[in-house]
Amino acid sequence: MTGPRTLLVMAGGTGGHVFPGLAVAHALREQGWKVVWLGNRTGMEATLVPKHDIPMEFIQFGGLRGKGLVTKFLLPLNLLRAFWQSIAALRRVRPSVVLGMGGYITFPAGMMASLLGRPLVLHEQNSIAGLANKVLAKVADRVLCAFPDTLPGGEWTGNPVREELAHLDAPEARYDQRSGPLRILVVGGSLGAAALNEVVPKAIALLPGGERPVVTHQAGAKQIDTLRANYAAAQVPAQTLPFIDDMARAYADADLVICRAGAMTVSEVAAAGVAAMFVPFPHAVDDHQTTNAEFLSKQGAALLVQQKDLTAEGLAQTIASLTRPQLKDMARLARGLAKPEATRRVAEICSQLARD
């Protein structure tokens, strides 16, 4: 070889696509690879990825779900433009391998990578594959999945998650050394989760004072004031935060996590080895958050409550019925279903397929 190998990561739109792509990018860069990212100027990747000193290429292409007739009518033209932009980017970058991590932009770029003979690796983060990956899986050299049996011929690698989660102590060591009230971590994500913000304070208020858990509740900057008002109205003390810098430590300190069921959240809960109650976002595409959560809940490794069934009374009863030994068993089962080597495995496959 005349120089370092080059990885082109295609990912955009949401953190669920971008963060696992970054994990693989860092792993290969530590091995001497050059990394370039292909995304959309309007996606979160446009501001997040450059902070990791990764150069970017951009194409213009968006989704169709929920869009009007004009957008659908213009699809052929927009797709043709995205194809040409992808070809130009691929010729500039000359990647040794292309890694598609999801998002609409992966479709035109992935198709052109295959057409130009570049090795194409796909990774699907959710339990139900997105439309772009369903199509690209037919032309990809390797198909990788975070959950079992998501795409035909796919290898179950798990989701690449933040490295520090794999280094946490075993659930048995963490749970056995605790005493006193349960510790509950509520995670709403960067945008918050209004249903959790409303129901959790009311549920805790229904518990007798001596049976109340210690609560840390993360809600996102836009909802933090409302959340704090909800706890004040319920007369429940809680640590309320707009964001959490050290999620690994937050997971490690919790007996129970109450959260949505995005692919990365489910994977992080398993990797950390912590008990969880998943409340899937009811409007997720193809209801994929429910099937994400079922990967753990059907094995007794998590609880699953649909948002329509989430009430203060029901949540209070559930919390009152849980014991630390029960939660420890749940956490142990969750850790057993984790794929701690996901980042290394995806990077390894990229290395195997790379060519000049």
From Swiss-Prot:
It is a peripheral membrane protein. Pathway: Cell wall biogenesis; peptidoglycan biosynthesis. GO terms for molecular function: UDP-N-acetyl-D-glucosamine:N-acetylmuramoyl-L-alanyl-D-glutamyl-meso-2,6-diaminopimelyl-D-alanyl-D-alanine-diphosphoundecaprenol 4-beta-N-acetylglucosaminlytransferase activity; undecaprenyldiphospho-muramoylpentapeptide beta-N-acetylglucosaminyltransferase activity. It is found in: Cell inner membrane. It is an enzyme of class 2 (transferase). UDP-N-acetyl-alpha-D-glucosamine binds at T14, G15, G16, N126, R162, S190, I244, Q289. It catalyses: di-trans,octa-cis-undecaprenyl diphospho-N-acetyl-alpha-D-muramoyl-L-alanyl-D-glutamyl-meso-2,6-diaminopimeloyl-D-alanyl-D-alanine + UDP-N-acetyl-alpha-D-glucosamine = di-trans,octa-cis-undecaprenyl diphospho-[N-acetyl-alpha-D-glucosaminyl-(1->4)]-N-acetyl-alpha-D-muramoyl-L-alanyl-D-glutamyl-meso-2,6-diaminopimeloyl-D-alanyl-D-alanine + UDP + H(+). Signal peptide: none annotated. Keywords: Cell cycle, Cell division, Cell inner membrane, Cell membrane, Cell shape, Cell wall biogenesis/degradation, Glycosyltransferase, Membrane, Peptidoglycan synthesis, Transferase. CDD domains: GT28_MurG (cd03785). Cell wall formation. Catalyzes the transfer of a GlcNAc subunit on undecaprenyl-pyrophosphoryl-MurNAc-pentapeptide (lipid intermediate I) to form undecaprenyl-pyrophosphoryl-MurNAc-(pentapeptide)GlcNAc (lipid intermediate II). Belongs to the glycosyltransferase 28 family. MurG subfamily. This is UDP-N-acetylglucosamine--N-acetylmuramyl-(pentapeptide) pyrophosphoryl-undecaprenol N-acetylglucosamine transferase. It comes from Cupriavidus necator (strain ATCC 17699 / DSM 428 / KCTC 22496 / NCIMB 10442 / H16 / Stanier 337). The lineage of its organism: Bacteria, Pseudomonadati, Pseudomonadota, Betaproteobacteria, Burkholderiales.
